[in-house]
Amino acid sequence: MHLLERQHDIQPLSRADMTIHLNGQPVAAAAGETVLNVLNAVGLRRLARNDHGQASGAFCGMGVCHCCLVAIDGRPKRRACQTVVRPGMRVETESNRFDQEERP
């Protein structure tokens, strides 16, 4: 499986310290960068869906608006802008909604 290309970095990634998985695809990441930075670097802008099925993406980039919610390692509703990447991390976009069967 080949790595997703980071075509949208502001500066080229000088050193990839790890690999994480975005929607099942591996991508290089650097220590200290956020999940949102990696998502932006590979061009993933649609991160979630609202109650009306409309796509949404990151808005504030600092954890206030909660528009960048993704599932990380199976845990829903994690803020991509506030989460630092870890080796082997698994990120799923547009999967932050609870299914009816999962509701308490």
Swiss-Prot record:
UniProt EC number: 1.4.99.5
Domain 2Fe-2S ferredoxin-type: residue ranges: 16-97
SUPFAM superfamilies: 2Fe-2S ferredoxin-like
Top-rank EC class of the record's enzyme: oxidoreductase
Stored Pfam families: Fer2_4 (PF13510)
Catalytic activity: glycine + 2 A = hydrogen cyanide + 2 AH2 + CO2
Record keywords: 2Fe-2S, Cell membrane, Iron, Iron-sulfur, Membrane, Metal-binding, Oxidoreductase
InterPro entries given in the database record: 2Fe-2S-bd_N, 2Fe-2S_ferredoxin-like_sf, 2Fe-2S_ferredoxin-type
Its job: A three-component membrane-bound flavoenzyme that catalyzes the formation of hydrogen cyanide, a secondary metabolite, by transfer of electrons to a cyanide-resistant branch of the aerobic respiratory chain.
Name assigned to this protein: Hydrogen cyanide synthase subunit HcnA
pH dependence per the UniProt record: Optimum pH is 8.3 (in the presence of Tris-HCl). Active from 7.3-7.8 in the presence of other buffers.
Record Gene3D superfamilies: 2Fe-2S iron-sulphur cluster binding domain, sarcosine oxidase, alpha subunit, N-terminal domain
Thermal dependence of function as given in the entry: Not stable at 0 degrees Celsius. Decrease in activity up to 40% immediately after freeze-drying procedure, with a further decrease up to 10% when stored at -10 degrees Celsius.
Notes on activation and inhibition: Oxygen is necessary for cyanogenesis. Activated by succinate, glycine methyl ester, glucose and D,L-methionine in addition to glycine. Phenazine methosulfate, methylene blue, 2,6-dichlorophenolindophenol (DCIP) and ferricyanide can replace oxygen for the reaction. Inhibited by pyrrolnitrin and acriflavine at 1 mM concentration.
Molecular function terms, GO-annotated: 2 iron, 2 sulfur cluster binding; glycine dehydrogenase (cyanide-forming) activity; metal ion binding
SUBUNIT field: Heterotrimer of HcnA, HcnB and HcnC.
